[in-house]
Amino acid sequence: MSKRFPVDVILQHNIDGTIIPIRLRFTSEEGERQEYTIKGYRDLSGQETRTMPDGVYVIGSDLVYQCKLLVNKEQRMVYLHRKSDGSSWFMTVIK
């Protein structure tokens, strides 16, 4: 299972009910605060109950996004997951 990092997520809530992740912020393992604008995403929410490639078990009502970030001029892919109770978000890095 991939390591989970707690993140703050800025979201756009559209009139049609869709939710778009815009930015994320987290504290690195070195204790440094980092912020990234999401350059692209795929909404993987609302699908069947399953285990994601990062090892996280999700159900159909969970919010899950695969997001593209630009980190030190390199493209990185991450999964964003909202905890089932809706209290917080975490990210896992896709290798």
Residues covered by each model-derived region:
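Cysteine-centric segments in proteins
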Residues: 1-95
